[in-house]
Regions:
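RNase H catalytic domain
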Residues: 1, 176-234, 238-243
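Flexible, low-complexity interdomain linkers flanking nucleic-acid-processing modules
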Residues: 1-54, 223-242, 246-272
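C-terminal reverse transcriptase regions that engage the nucleic-acid substrate
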Residues: 6, 11-116, 121
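Beta-sheet entry/capping signal
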Residues: 13-14, 27, 54, 61-62, ...
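Acidic, metal-ligating active-site segments
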Residues: 16, 124-149
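Mobile genetic element proteins and their domesticated derivatives, centered on retroelements
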Residues: 18, 52, 56, 60, ...
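Flexible loop/turn segments at secondary-structure boundaries
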Residues: 65, 72-75, 131-134, 142-145, ...
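A short, polar/acidic, helix/strand-boundary loop motif
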Residues: 142-172, 176
Length: 272
């Protein structure tokens, strides 16, 4: 214990599993400081992949902006380019735009410690687009007589190369959300917290809440969702009020700065 105290008192920042812990402000940050790329550097599939992997973000605080290069990578894979073959200029332009902007997110942080009690609510938002599907979890608490909403965790996944319908991708997003909130409840050891899961897909909500002769694809995922969550906890949210829309479509780092991503939707802060 003595050694730990000495370390905390002598360093302003620590690295915890690749995440920066700012001790002065007790917040967590992601490292986005990369070596600069000059115009002489050849942009290849290997370089894009290695750069994307350098953003270690297990919480998902930067997930909307880190989705863009992942979608770009899938586009590169479809081209069947060699690892060290120079990429087309339109791909290079997209990558460099993201690379130059990602640096502005180095100051983004989330509180390390969240005040969780028996009155805390977990709100899960899920969504999908043609290129990806995603889920995110926000904790809603009353702190000093004020409503506090904070991002707990988020995850986005690139859609499979095999073409799937939007409703099926939305169902996969529901699986992501169910797994996320289930892991959070286990980590907190508070299984009785109120959980609400929000989707803007009426089709997937129908699959989850009703019983029918679904296809194997739908049936397997509905079964998992029902095992991890309560059916009555799933609710509809209009698309323009679904914060996961930002996560499933992705956005540039600059757009992300002006969004409500870390605060959650404004309506969630209204008194019940």
């Amino acid at each position: 214990m003595w050694r730990v105290k000495v370390l905390i008192n002598t360093q302003a920042k620590l690295f915890i599993l690749g995440i920066i812990w700012d001790l002065d402000n007790d917040v967590l940050k992601c490292c986005t400081n990369f070596d600069s790329l000059t115009c002489e550097v050849k942009i290849t599939k290997r370089l894009v992949l290695s750069t994307v992997q350098k953003v270690f973000d297990p919480i998902g605080m930067l997930a909307p902006s880190t989705l863009l290069p992942k979608l770009l990578l899938q586009e590169i894979w479809k081209m069947k380019r060699a690892w060290d073959q120079e990429l087309p200029q339109n791909i290079v332009n997209k990558f460099m735009k993201w690379f130059n902007e990602i640096q502005i997110l180095k100051g983004i942080s989330v509180p390390r410690c969240m005040k969780i009690d028996i009155f805390t609510e977990l709100h899960v938002f899920v969504d999908a687009s043609k290129g990806s599907y995603a889920g995110c979890v926000f904790a809603r608490s009353i702190v000093d007589s004020r409503v506090s909403v904070i991002l707990v965790r988020a995850k986005s996944r690139v859609a499979p190369l095999k073409l799937l319908s939007i409703p099926r991708l939305e169902l996969m997003a529901c699986c992501v959300g169910a797994r996320l909130v289930n892991s959070i409840l286990k980590a907190l050891n508070m299984p009785d917290l109120k959980v609400t899961l929000w989707s803007d897909s009426t089709t997937t909500l129908w699959w989850i809440k009703e019983y029918g002769n679904w296809s194997v694809f739908v049936a397997n995922r509905v079964k998992e969702i029902r095992q991890l969550t309560q059916i009555q906890s799933w609710k509809y949210v209009p698309g323009n009020m679904n914060i996961a829309d930002l996560l499933s479509r992705g956005c540039s780092p600059r757009q992300m700065l002006s969004s409500r991503w870390w605060e959650g939707p404004s309506w969630l802060k209204q008194n019940s």
